[in-house]
From Swiss-Prot:
EC number annotated for this UniProt entry: 4.1.1.37
One GO molecular-function entry: uroporphyrinogen decarboxylase activity
Protein name listed in UniProt: Uroporphyrinogen decarboxylase
Listed InterPro entries: UROD/MetE-like_sf (IPR038071), Uroporphyrinogen_deCO2ase_HemE (IPR006361), Uroporphyrinogen_deCOase (IPR000257)
Similarity comment: family membership: Belongs to the uroporphyrinogen decarboxylase family.
Pfam families, A to Z: URO-D
Domain of life: Bacteria
Catalytic activity: uroporphyrinogen III + 4 H(+) = coproporphyrinogen III + 4 CO2
UniProt cross-references to Gene3D superfamilies, sorted A to Z: 3.20.20.210
Length: 344
């Protein structure tokens, strides 16, 4: 295959690149008209279970927007069903779990994952994409143990994580048993994605910002160390860490054996650099800005790129996922602008 665009991998290695790489969290699906047409007929689980469809949705933004990476279209809940979690995606709510974890005996009932047997459709999608179709690296992903555990304990999305924190503080045996279980599930799931052809992995710890630094260090960080070191022990694949509203944890993340630290829109690249972050930085346009007039978007994107170019080792992205209301043409223009502005 000729001229594969490996800008994102080169950036992570600290090599000189022709431009700043760009991709968008939730770029696959969401606002694309082709995707919306599919969603009239199929649910999220329907699409992810059909490799041809899933590969099509994953590739759309690369073809339409010219992004420098593809990100697998699937949900962080994907590995939970096979281990015994009764999860359903309810429209307008998100994942709903009818058998929440309440005790250590509930954790004991969970099984481990065998990705080839349990999620072959995920691996087949990756194989379809990476064999000749894509000219950019494919990002695989997993939810982090805390975020997966919070869904499993709360029974769905939560605003304050009361049940999760109650278990953490009040029943450490169950908490750490669940974390250890999810670490192993996540390692096996990620390693299978890499073996199928994923060239980067993003770990989404979407909700971990709900914890303070002290609790993160004690209840979460050991599991994150195990997870990342477990992946790296098998493959030297770049790992991106991302969570929302977690700027107080940036130094904790910087200690982990990750390669890229994803910033949400609240923390600038220059302030993360001043805090001593030495990883590649990813981000961090406020996704709501994509609904603003173009001159405002361009100005904000330029500010982020200026900070990124001054620092080096920067991947342009949003500070969270694309909203469904965003016009596909806006994402195309942003990608083009990033490429043009940084290649001068």
């Amino acid at each position: 295959m000729h001229n594969k665009n490996n800008t994102i991998l080169q950036t992570i290695k600290g090599e000189k690149t022709s431009h700043t790489p760009v991709w968008f969290m939730r770029q696959a699906g969401r606002s694309q008209p082709e995707y919306r047409k599919l969603k009239e007929k199929y649910s999220l689980f329907d699409i992810t279970h059909q490799p041809e469809l899933c590969a099509y949705v994953t590739q759309l933004p690369v073809d339409n927007y010219n992004t420098d990476a593809a990100v697998l279209y699937k949900d962080i809940m994907t590995p939970l069903k096979p281990i015994g979690v009764d999860v359903d995606i309810k429209s307008g709510i998100g994942p709903v779990i009818s058998n929440p974890i309440k005790s250590v005996s509930d954790v004991d009932k969970l099984t481990q994952i065998d990705p080839k047997r349990d999620v072959p459709y995920v691996l087949e999608t990756i194989q379809l994409l990476t064999q000749e179709k894509l000219n950019v690296p494919l990002i695989g992903f997993t939810g982090a143990p805390f975020t997966l555990a919070s869904y499993m304990i709360e029974g769905g999305p939560s605003k304050n994580y009361n049940y999760t924190k109650a278990m953490m503080y009040g029943d450490e045996a169950t908490w750490f048993a669940l974390m250890n279980h999810l670490v192993q599930v996540s390692i096996d799931y990620v390693v299978a994605q890499v073996e199928a052809g994923a060239e980067l992995i993003q770990i989404f710890d979407s909700w971990v910002g709900a914890l303070n630094v002290q609790d993160y260090r004690y209840y979460i960080k050991p599991s994150m160390d195990k997870l990342i070191n477990g992946i790296k022990a098998k493959y030297d694949v770049p790992v991106i860490m991302f969570g929302v509203g977690a700027s107080h944890l940036i130094n904790e993340w910087n200690d982990l054996a990750i390669d890229v630290l994803g910033l949400d829109w609240r923390t600038s690249i220059s302030s993360a650099t001043k805090m001593g972050v030495n990883k590649t930085l990813q981000g961090n346009l406020d996704p709501s800005l994509l609904l603003a007039p173009w001159d405002v978007i361009e100005q904000r994107v330029r500010e982020i790129l200026d900070e990124g170019m001054e620092r080096g080792k920067h991947i342009f992205n949003l500070g969270h996922g694309v909203f469904p209301e965003v016009q596909p043409d806006t994402l195309k223009r942003v990608t083009q602008f990033v490429h043009d502005y940084t290649s001068k």
